[in-house]
Amino acid sequence: MRHRKHSNQLGVKKEHREALLANLSKALLTHGRIKTTLKKAKVLRPFVEKVITLAKNGSLHSRRMAISRVRDTDAVHGLFDDKVEQFRDREGGY
């Protein structure tokens, strides 16, 4: 049963939501901070945390999975090569 499995859909279709999250995460990884609405930020947080967890793994497969989610190779390479050291000791809540 899928009761209470509802995630916030932001009032848009699936493709629009995926593109929105990819663009917001690209901006966040590139600039370090962004200005957005509270609802979008609440949906973006677990999305970006999963990408950072992939970066902590550091394998080629993890890099490809992150590129498929964020859809920007430069932002992902910056995360995997430079920024991941900030998050090595943290277990979450980046």
Label the predicted regions.
Residues 1-12, 16-19, 23-94:
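Structured, basic alpha/beta domains of bacterial-type, RNA-associated proteins
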